[in-house]
Amino acid sequence: MDRIINILKTLDRPGTDKVIEFMEENNYKGSRCYGHHKYAGGLVDHSLEVYDHMMQNRGKLPKDSIIVCAFFHDLGKASKSTRQIKDHEGRSVRLLDKCGFPLTAQERNAILTHHQIEGFLNDPLRKCLSQADIDSTGRWKEANDPNYNSSLSNILKNIGLKFISKLCKVFVSESYL
């Protein structure tokens, strides 16, 4: 958690201290994710994995936007409760608004829609966040199934993406970044 707080403190945006305070008061450090990183502290591990991946693959995207999306895309999952939070994407944005933390339109869109494929190709920040989230969560594990692999590969090929089953990743042309 210390690494996350140190990175967040590099942001020059109003409300950053309030967001950090929220994270500390609402067990961000001990929160878990559901479906992946299901252990106490899983949210921190997942967020750091997303951040590291986004930084390695950011192209010309602003570092501030990478920080915001990586650490706040699942902010809505932070809770003292052990129950699963519904609509964590919307809750994340509402919490940031409540803290007075300004988001760019691109950041807001990326956080709200990082689990959706619609519009994926049109927004480099969202694409970077979604890919990092996919890589960290291990989604699309079905790739080991040859039938699923073939079907998914054809679908992605039709929208300009390439699926590499061995790595369980979606690679997007560098020209979009």
What are these regions (language model features)?
Residues M1-L177:
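Metal-dependent phosphohydrolase cores
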